[in-house]
């Protein structure tokens, strides 16, 4: 293994990439405290030496002039920030925070964090807010992307956590990508998928997506499901698998519960109505089912297309039903694999950052779980509230209504990333106190703050994170933090000490990690054997890893035993429900949002890279050519795109790879990059009943030429292979075993 080295002028070390949840291990070199080179680590299990454009351009975005290098405060929102010392900033913030708690109670304050926080920071947040202040009002931007997957795994399989690992790509003979544009959002993992197909062209790659994405361009079968049509499509596939008897009777009998109810539901409902609601021709539905049914090993990657929905948990359940039906789980090359979009979204789940969770996959509404954590934290019985806290959207609604008075925001930019941004901005404006902890200033959110805490970021600190495949990794610093910036956990611990709470006198991140992992012992995410000393030596281990001698676990449920009351996975029949907001005469089109290859989240990093900005310089709206004609638009023209909540002005890109009636806007741009460009001014803040995840993938909009915009010459704004009419695309696979 490579170890961190320094000769006083140059340093090099390994760390986990700070972008998506693939968990690419990177080697970086610095000279005079400036990063000059980054490359993938060849023997790293996640990336095998691979690196995407975002990772490769990290040297361009770390040491920039807009780094937040000193704490800052201001007396009023209309006033200017002034730099202060850490002592002054903490004293000021704690005094105001405590005054609000004293007057309005502990549930009047909240912490809104991120999947970019290290596990050590996540743990300290919970200990402060849930164990000391006495409120469960901590949540994360992971609520916006992963909550439905968490709820889906837990309800179907008994616990959170993806059963497969990346190595399963090499054993799969059918790979489905459902509601994920892996080629742009998780490119290094998708490179492994492409390598698998290159090595064996008979491998199926099936992509289910309303858009012909760069991922769909690589597919042997592209299934253009209607927006919101996933559950009826899954149910229709289940019906065909039952009728063709392409199911695993032995697995169903030995390892599952609820099959009779599922069978009755699937066979009693109208197959034709499911096909119609899916928006997919019946012949294509049958083709999809046949390809899945004949596969010996079937692996499904899925992401925001399933999760970001008011029925996201149900979509997860419906997909898992198909894997249980075919016995495609708990073996090499198989399983439902939820991809995370941030480097430590998994770690936040393990550490209990979400408002209903406690460390070690425990839950605040379970008295035994609360007692376990209170004992570990040396807190009196009853210290942890019995009521789950507010979730992300609920927090901002509570700010707007006055129920919540103060919010501490860390490592995220909700003034761009939250749905219904007009509501979010009204909410933040009404807050008595907004603390923002970030590496950069200004951002759209720091502009609204009262107190700014400067945080060290990637390459500047030691920390731990968990990737999509349950791989726990250590990152080491390559440079020193600028100015007075310090790691997130230190900021939170100092704040807690200022509030008078004990148990926060940590000297190193390793102390925190070693305090945290005993709380996972015996839990589904058991990391008791992944000590800081072992991580420093071995770099990464995959949980469950219960002892210091344990090598880690490649995939879950290989014995067919699940962490449920009867040890069986659950079939959960789910019916089709229309999205919360539907189209009508006034708003006849559907808006969906998503990522681009060149950017990440709200561009607080990628927007500083000249190479990445050159690739994607500005926001746009993609429109099907028939819809463009109907609404009087041509490529390059500025259009006015409006929902019931807001209006944008964006240049048009014509893309026949969209379903008719669907428009697409990337969500990366905010007000700092131009007015009326943030997609989330349009999106709806409707959330699911259990997962509480917002509906980013479906809202009703109208489209028209901007009244004061010049009409350009008709030309395509972009020419790519996906600029072809959308239909189910079939590519015949080739057998590698045929005789010559």
Report residues per predicted region:
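Long, contiguous, secondary-structure-rich segments that constitute the structural scaffold
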Residues: 482-484, 488-538, 606-622, 626-740
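Short beta-alpha connecting loops at secondary-structure transitions
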Residues: 217-225, 454-456, 460, 470-482, ...
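Conserved short loop/turn motifs at secondary-structure junctions
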Residues: 110-117, 277-280, 303-310, 342, ...
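Flexible, glycine/charged-enriched surface loops at secondary-structure junctions
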Residues: 104-108, 247-252, 299, 330-337, ...
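N-terminal export/assembly segments and adjacent metallocofactor-ligating motifs
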Residues: 1-246, 254, 258, 262, ...
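Flexible glycine/proline-enriched surface loops and loop-helix/loop-strand junctions
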Residues: 77, 175, 218-219, 268-272, ...
């Amino acid at each position: 293994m490579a170890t961190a080295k320094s000769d006083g002028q140059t340093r090099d070390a390994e760390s986990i990439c700070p972008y998506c949840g693939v968990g690419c291990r990177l080697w970086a070199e610095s000279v005079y405290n400036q990063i000059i080179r980054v490359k993938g680590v060849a023997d790293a299990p996640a990336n095998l030496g691979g690196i995407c454009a975002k990772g490769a351009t990290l040297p361009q975005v770390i040491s920039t002039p807009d780094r937040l290098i000193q704490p800052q405060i201001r007396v009023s929102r209309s006033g200017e920030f002034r730099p202060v010392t850490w002592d002054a900033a903490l004293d000021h913030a704690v005094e105001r925070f405590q005054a609000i708690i004293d007057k309005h109670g502990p549930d009047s304050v909240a912490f809104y964090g991120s999947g970019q926080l290290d596990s050590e920071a996540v743990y300290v947040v919970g200990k402060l807010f849930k164990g000391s202040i006495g409120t469960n009002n901590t949540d994360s931007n992971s609520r916006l992307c992963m909550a439905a997957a968490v709820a889906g795994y837990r309800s179907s399989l008994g616990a959170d956590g993806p059963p497969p690992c990346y190595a399963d790509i090499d054993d799969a003979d059918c790979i489905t990508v459902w509601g994920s544009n892996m080629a742009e959002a998780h490119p290094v993992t998708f490179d492994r998928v492409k390598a698998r197909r290159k090595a064996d062209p008979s491998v199926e790659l099936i992509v289910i997506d309303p858009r012909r994405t760069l991922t769909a361009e690589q597919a042997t079968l592209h299934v253009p499901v209607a927006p919101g049509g996933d559950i009826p499509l899954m149910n229709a596939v289940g019906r065909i698998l039952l009728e063709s008897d392409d199911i695993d009777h032995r697995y169903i009998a030995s390892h599952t519960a609820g099959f009779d109810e599922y069978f009755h539901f699937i066979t009693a409902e109208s197959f034709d109505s499911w096909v119609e609601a899916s928006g997919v021709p019946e012949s294509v539905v049958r083709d999809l089912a046949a390809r899945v049914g004949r596969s010996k090993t079937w692996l499904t990657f899925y992401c925001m297309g399933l999760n970001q929905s008011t029925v996201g948990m149900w979509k997860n359940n419906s997909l898992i039903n198909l894997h249980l039906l075919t016995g495609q789980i708990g073996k090499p090359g198989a399983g439902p694999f939820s991809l995370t979009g941030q480097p430590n979204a998994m770690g936040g789940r393990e550490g209990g950052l979400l408002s209903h969770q406690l460390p070690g996959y425990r839950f605040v509404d379970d008295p035994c779980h609360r007692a376990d954590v209170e004992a570990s934290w040396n807190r009196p019985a009853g210290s942890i509230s019995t009521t789950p806290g507010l979730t992300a959207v609920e927090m901002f609604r509570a700010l707007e209504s006055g129920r919540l008075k103060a919010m501490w925001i860390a490592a995220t930019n909700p003034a761009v990333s939250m749905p219904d941004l007009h509501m979010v901005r009204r909410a933040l404006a009404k807050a008595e106190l907004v603390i923002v902890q970030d590496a950069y200033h200004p951002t759209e959110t720091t502009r609204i703050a009262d107190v700014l805490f400067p945080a060290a970021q990637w390459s500047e600190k030691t920390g731990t994170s968990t990737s999509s495949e349950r791989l726990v990794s250590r990152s080491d610093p390559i440079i020193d933090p600028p100015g007075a910036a310090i790691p997130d956990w230190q900021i939170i611990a100092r704040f807690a000490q200022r509030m008078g709470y004990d148990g926060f006198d940590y000297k190193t991140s390793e102390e925190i990690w070693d305090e945290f992992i005993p709380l996972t012992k015996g839990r589904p995410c058991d990391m008791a054997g992944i000590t800081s000393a072992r991580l420093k030596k071995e770099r990464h281990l995959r949980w469950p890893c219960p002892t210091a001698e344990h090598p880690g676990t490649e995939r879950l449920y290989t014995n067919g035993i699940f962490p449920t009351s009867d040890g069986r996975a659950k079939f959960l029949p789910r019916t089709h429900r229309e999205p919360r907001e539907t189209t009508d005469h006034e708003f006849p089109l559907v808006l969906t949002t998503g990522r681009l290859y060149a950017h990440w989240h709200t561009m607080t990093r990628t927007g500083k890279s000249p190479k990445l900005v050159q690739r994607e310089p500005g926001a746009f709206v993609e429109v099907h050519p028939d819809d463009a004609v109907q609404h009087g638009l041509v490529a390059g023209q500025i259009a006015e795109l409006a929902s019931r909540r807001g209006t944008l002005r964006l240049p048009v890109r014509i893309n026949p790879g969209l379903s008719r009636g669907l428009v697409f806007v990337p969500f990366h741009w905010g007000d700092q990059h131009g007015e009326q460009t943030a997609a989330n001014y349009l999106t709806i803040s409707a959330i699911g009943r259990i997962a509480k995840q917002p509906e980013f993938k479906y809202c009703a909009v109208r489209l028209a030429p901007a009244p004061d915009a010049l009409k350009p010459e008709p030309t395509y704004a972009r020419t790519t292979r996906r600029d072809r009419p959308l239909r189910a695309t079939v590519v015949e696979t080739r057998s590698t075993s045929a005789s010559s």
